[in-house]
Amino acid sequence: MISGIKKPSVLFLVFLFIFLTVFAGCTEEKITTGEDFSFTALDGETKHLNDFYGKVIVLDCMAVNCQPCMFQMFELKKISENYSKNDVTILSIDVWVSSGETVSMLQDTIDAFKNQVNMTLDWTFGLDDLQGTIQNTYASAGVPTLYIFDKKGNIYYSHVGYEDYLIIASKLDMVLSQG
């Protein structure tokens, strides 16, 4: 009897996970000004979103304890490899700091990618503040959440949930073509 209950429950959970992964999200191509924020980089330095104006910015609101966020790293690595760092910068910000995620957990995740799958994550990583300022502003619907900002800091694109490289690349190509 118990095993009969588990099978439908597992199937339901698998279906629910697939549904949420595929259909979660909100895609908008409207231009609005991104609200500036600060974050703590892995080296302890405080950085601001506006420090990166002049380049197209891919903001990845993520968490180390989020499996879809880890899958998103593979797509962001393709972006890193295929776009000039003079044109596009990637910021992966762990927004679950208020849930206990730390610099060492984030660094361990970066190291695990290098050691376990031979992949260097060569972009800027940082942590939200304890109040969850970035999470509340940019990732209140969940993680991963991806934003693309134009060179002036306007939001060009946003998506909640895992996003494929080809979609990200097409959005980057469009915003880069606008100058």
Residues covered by each model-derived region:
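Thiol-/selenol-based redox modules, centered on thioredoxin-like
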Residues: 142-179
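N-terminal "domain-start" segment that seeds a small globular fold
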Residues: 26-50
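Conserved redox-active cysteine motifs that mediate thiol-disulfide chemistry
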Residues: 53, 61-78
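Short, internal strand/loop/helix patches
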Residues: 107-151
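Thiol-based oxidoreductase modules, predominantly thioredoxin-like and allied folds used
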Residues: 87-103, 119-130
